[in-house]
């Protein structure tokens, strides 16, 4: 369907079940995350100029409200907010299929990095590829994500670790925003690892990023957020504090890769620094859980990465019961998780991480939006929010966990436009 103005006006009628996930901030804990605010049908949603103007019972829709709208009949269908993938490494060069086989043979993620694989391997490929090559690859991934109901994607740099390539990655994200339907949230992550030019000198590398790369990222308006890999043997607390403080002073939001490999106090530091989110958290401590539960920092969990690494999953049930706000992200990247599968995220979260399907929906909608600071505009179906929705092939949201491993999306709606239909 062409992206003409009238296509941003949409009337979705005869909805069997409408899941609104209403709210404008992260939902913390079992009770809040379990409340997804369903309306049993017949229900309806009206979108005008890309913004939701009505969401409720179809009987309450006046004819004047839908004048000039395209109609979409959702008889026998469940409608939910568009999914928000709040953690991806979308733009990268090359693949690492051989490393996956090494992992299957028993090599650890850290041992592969020590052999010159891991992030360093992708860094070399990303430095070598052109912007057009990187853009074409990222565009394919976005198209696949759109088919699974994703309407907003966080996209990190971090495979350059020098000025030229970090800017190149972020320009690709900027350009893709205008060349495909999904909304992108750009994150500068030069501190993904220490660049080979600074091997053994991580503090000097952080200073290079703060003094030479970050100012140029900000000057060119290429990022909204800054991320860092806080981990034993990568970047310590003081290096993290230096990087993220500089980013905040430059006007960026901040987030962290935290407590992925070993308990390292990353969650506590993320809460202290006011991060939008602390991500991974496979090895979070009880003190870290308490710190996140008492803060506004979202705990973004990445089940597909744990699955790919054959690692223990993050303690989602324990975190939610303690009062944390949990989001789910794919962690799409060419190494530890070459997948952006929403069906796999739902299956792992509910079958192996102890989350209810309602909590998983919250984690992929309003809490995912909060993890990128956009819960005021996306993540729920209510007047004033963007018209981002998913129409399932089934009448109930419960099929998202029940019919596992399958893409159940019939339509993806972005800003009032039907951008994908499963034909």
UniProtKB/Swiss-Prot annotation:
What is this enzyme's catalytic activity, as reactions? 4-imidazolone-5-propanoate + H2O = N-formimidoyl-L-glutamate
Biological process annotations from GO: L-histidine catabolic process to glutamate and formamide; L-histidine catabolic process to glutamate and formate
Name of a matching Pfam family: Amidohydro_1
Query: Binding residues for 4-imidazolone-5-propanoate, per the UniProt record?
Result: 96, 159, 192, 260, 336
Principal EC category: hydrolase
Q: Where is it mainly found?
A: cytoplasm
GO MF terms listed in the record are: imidazolonepropionase activity; iron ion binding; zinc ion binding
Cofactor list: Zn(2+); Fe(3+)
Q: Annotated pathway, please?
A: Amino-acid degradation; L-histidine degradation into L-glutamate; N-formimidoyl-L-glutamate from L-histidine: step 3/3
The annotation note on the cofactor reads: Binds 1 zinc or iron ion per subunit.
Residues involved in Fe(3+) binding: 87, 89, 257, 331
State the UniProt keywords alphabetically.
Cytoplasm, Histidine metabolism, Hydrolase, Iron, Metal-binding, Zinc
What does UniProt give as the signal peptide span?
A: none
**Recorded E.C. number(s)?**
3.5.2.7
Q: Give the location in the cell.
A: Cytoplasm
Gene Ontology CC entries for this record: cytoplasm
Residue positions annotated to bind Zn(2+) are 87, 89, 257, 331
State where N-formimidoyl-L-glutamate binds: 159, 333, 335
Question: What InterPro entries does this protein map onto?
Answer: Amidohydro-rel, HutI, Metal-dep_hydrolase_composite, Metal_Hydrolase
Q: What does this protein do?
A: Catalyzes the hydrolytic cleavage of the carbon-nitrogen bond in imidazolone-5-propanoate to yield N-formimidoyl-L-glutamate. It is the third step in the universal histidine degradation pathway.
Which protein family is named in the record?
Answer: Belongs to the metallo-dependent hydrolases superfamily. HutI family.
Q: What is this protein called?
A: Imidazolonepropionase
């Amino acid at each position: 369907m062409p992206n003409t103005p009238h296509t941003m006006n949409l009337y979705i009628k005869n909805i069997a079940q409408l899941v609104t996930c209403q709210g404008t901030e992260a939902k913390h804990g079992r009770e809040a995350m379990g409340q997804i605010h369903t309306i049993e049908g017949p229900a309806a949603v009206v979108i005008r100029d890309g913004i939701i103007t009505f969401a409720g019972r179809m009987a309450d829709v006046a004819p004047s409200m839908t004048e000039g709208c395209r109609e979409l009949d959702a008889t026998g269908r469940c409608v939910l907010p568009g999914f928000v993938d709040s953690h991806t490494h979308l733009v990268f060069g090359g693949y690492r299929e051989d490393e996956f086989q090494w992992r299957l043979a028993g090599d650890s993620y850290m041992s592969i990095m020590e052999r010159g694989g891991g992030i360093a391997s992708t860094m070399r490929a990303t430095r070598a590829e052109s912007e057009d090559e990187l853009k074409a690859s990222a565009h394919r991934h976005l198209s696949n994500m759109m088919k699974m109901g994703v309407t907003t994607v966080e996209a990190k740099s971090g495979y350059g670790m020098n000025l030229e390539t970090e800017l190149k990655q972020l320009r690709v994200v900027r350009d893709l925003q205008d060349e495909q339907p999904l909304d992108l949230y750009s994150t500068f992550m030069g501190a993904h690892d220490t660049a080979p030019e600074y091997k053994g000198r991580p503090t000097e590398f952080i200073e290079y990023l703060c003094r030479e790369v970050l100012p140029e990222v900000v000057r060119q308006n290429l990022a909204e957020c800054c991320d860092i890999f806080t981990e034993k043997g990568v970047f310590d607390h003081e290096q993290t504090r230096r990087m993220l403080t500089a980013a905040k002073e430059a006007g960026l939001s901040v987030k962290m890769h935290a407590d992925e490999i070993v308990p390292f106090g990353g969650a506590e530091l993320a809460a202290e620094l006011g991060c939008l989110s602390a991500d991974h958290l496979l090895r979070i401590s009880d003190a870290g859980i308490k710190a996140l539960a008492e803060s506004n920092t979202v705990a973004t969990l990445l089940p597909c990465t744990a699955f790919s690494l054959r690692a223990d999953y993050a303690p989602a049930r324990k975190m939610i019961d303690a009062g944390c706000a949990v989001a789910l992200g794919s962690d799409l990247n060419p190494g530890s998780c070459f997948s952006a599968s929403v069906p796999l995220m739902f299956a792992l979260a509910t079958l192996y991480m102890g989350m209810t399907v309602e909590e998983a929906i919250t984690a992929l909608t309003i809490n995912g939006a909060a993890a990128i600071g956009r819960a005021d505009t996306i993540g729920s179906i209510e007047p004033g929010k963007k018209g981002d929705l998913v129409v399932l092939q089934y009448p109930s949201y419960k099929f998202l966990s029940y019919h596992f491993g399958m893409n159940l999306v019939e339509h993806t709606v972005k800003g009032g436009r039907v951008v994908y239909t499963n034909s």
